[in-house]
Amino acid sequence: MSDTWSSIQAHKKQLDSLRERLQRRRKQDSGHLDLRNPEAALSPTFRSDSPVPTAPTSGGPKPSTASAVPELATDPELEKKLLHHLSDLALTLPTDAVSICLAISTPDAPATQDGVESLLQKFAAQELIEVKRGLLQDDAHPTLVTYADHSKLSAMMGAVAEKKGPGEVAGTVTGQKRRAEQDSTTVAAFASSLVSGLNSSASEPAKEPAKKSRKHAASDVDLEIESLLNQQSTKEQQSKKVSQEILELLNTTTAKEQSIVEKFRSRGRAQVQEFCDYGTKEECMKASDADRPCRKLHFRRIINKHTDESLGDCSFLNTCFHMDTCKYVHYEIDACMDSEAPGSKDHTPSQELALTQSVGGDSSADRLFPPQWICCDIRYLDVSILGKFAVVMADPPWDIHMELPYGTLTDDEMRRLNIPVLQDDGFLFLWVTGRAMELGRECLNLWGYERVDEIIWVKTNQLQRIIRTGRTGHWLNHGKEHCLVGVKGNPQGFNQGLDCDVIVAEVRSTSHKPDEIYGMIERLSPGTRKIELFGRPHNVQPNWITLGNQLDGIHLLDPDVVARFKQRYPDGIISKPKNL
């Protein structure tokens, strides 16, 4: 569509140029009638607006062979047929001269392609039609008609029908000669302007390659300029180099950071054993096509009399509450080691040896204070007697509207807890779940903490797979829990960047949080006093004081804490205050 429109606009510009030249020649020259072509003077007035190809006079300059237009006699019948064919509304455009010639040719009056193309150029000059190639003639590429003005073509057909016949021309030759003398100037101007137009048209194809070459050269220059503008200057390169060096220095670990990492690195062999991806020993040998299983840890199926293996594995596995009657398959650790395996003793050092390597290998290891705990109702304990702590961790019994095997606290009771007295500067780790996630954030702000991080515990089952069936969650089964991390004041002496905020660990009993959290906190703040609220017997840890109502009595070793506790509670009984 764009090529057709470009051709139309180019043709219109060419016609405008021819008209301008014709008007200038009319004002400047006074031409004479071409005696060798008297028929030009006898043409109807409606044809006088377009230049008709004529042969040059003997005295005038001869055009070049490439631009010469052969003189063709106009056939009135052919012109009439061509006008009728072009004025047909059913004609599909664009169409070429060859197709038109075949359409209007008859056995009695065959039409030639040269005659058709000559008439098409004539009609194009009269603005009856629009052609793609302008005024040039080329046998290899016939003229292409792109547009036809049906109203002008119909008027032209009427004028041709009223035209006088050849026999009447002789009787009116005197009047025609008089008219020819009056229009001699116009005819001469037509001829001269046509020759100049053909010469300029013939030179246009030769100019097109030159224009294209200039455009290509200009585009190459633009590309070179753009590439030069995109290149960095020497100053920019130096600035970028300095920025890269600063970034490398910032990313390089300092000697202190390397010392801290080395301090917490495991001594000797790692005290963990990796699970096999195939689960049981049978599946491991089948997958590896070997005679014996790999050295990793495997599971053994528990098949009881009531077990139906076709049902598959139990969704709860080792946390199933009805394992003695459950018909699904359960598992246990296959602790039977292959004693005949070569080098097995080298790969399984004894626990005593490993502990000796761990403790004796690091003479600068901090000594841990033994665990301490108090069995009490935290709502009524005066926690101010315990002193200040660097880290506080709490796993509150949130009221999440579920049936739980332990008592819960209301939202107001959680807000009234005297947590701020435990710390001036330090961190608070608060476990939340369900709707308590928003309440936990509210409590952090109420107690004077700013939330700075959030640890995610991704729960796995006994087979080390992501759990898909849990006992928590309203619309979706919960496969993770959150631990909000808040900071208070301006804590100093804490290690940064040693651990990430994701823990992947196996679920155990209800509300039993992963033990990995203790190692993470100890690396964050080694050798400092820490306290855990709402703890249970499995939560007691070295360097920690654990508070909870499920602990076994009172076990305090710090002399200062023991003195303050005896002063506050002489009989050792923590009861509900009378004012509550």
From Swiss-Prot:
Q: Where is this region: Positively charged region required for RNA-binding?
A: 465-478
Q: Where is this region: Interphase loop?
A: 462-479
Q: What is the effect of changing S48A?
A: Does not affect nuclear localization, interaction with METTL14 or WTAP or catalytic activity
Q: What induces it?
A: Overexpressed in a number of cancer tissues, such as lung adenocarcinoma and colon adenocarcinoma.
Cross-link Glycyl lysine isopeptide (Lys-Gly) (interchain with G-Cter in SUMO1) maps to which residues of the chain?
Answer: K177, K211, K212, K215
**N-acetylserine modifications at:** S2
**What does the UniProt entry list as the effect of changing K177R?**
In 4KR; strongly decreased sumoylation
Result of altering N477A: Decreased methyltransferase activity
| Activity control, per UniProt | Methyltransferase activity is regulated by miRNAs via a sequence pairing mechanism. Methyltransferase activity is inhibited by sumoylation.
Q: What catalytic activity does the UniProt entry give for this protein?
A: an adenosine in mRNA + S-adenosyl-L-methionine = an N(6)-methyladenosine in mRNA + S-adenosyl-L-homocysteine + H(+)
**Site feature (Interaction with METTL14) residues:** E438, R441
List where in the cell it is found: Nucleus; Nucleus speckle; Cytoplasm
Q: Name one GO biological process term.
A: circadian rhythm
For this protein, what is the EC number? 2.1.1.348
UniProt keyword Metal-binding, yes or no = no
PANTHER family recorded for this chain? N6-ADENOSINE-METHYLTRANSFERASE, N6-ADENOSINE-METHYLTRANSFERASE CATALYTIC SUBUNIT
Q: How does it assemble?
A: Heterodimer; heterodimerizes with METTL14 to form an antiparallel heterodimer that constitutes an active methyltransferase. Component of the WMM complex, a N6-methyltransferase complex composed of a catalytic subcomplex, named MAC, and of an associated subcomplex, named MACOM. The MAC subcomplex is composed of METTL3 and METTL14. The MACOM subcomplex is composed of WTAP, ZC3H13, CBLL1/HAKAI, VIRMA, and, in some cases of RBM15 (RBM15 or RBM15B). Interacts with NCBP1/CBP80. Interacts with EIF4E. Interacts with EIF3B.
Identify its protein family.
Answer: Belongs to the MT-A70-like family.
Task: Report what the protein is called.
Answer: N(6)-adenosine-methyltransferase catalytic subunit METTL3
| Organism, as annotated | Homo sapiens (Human)
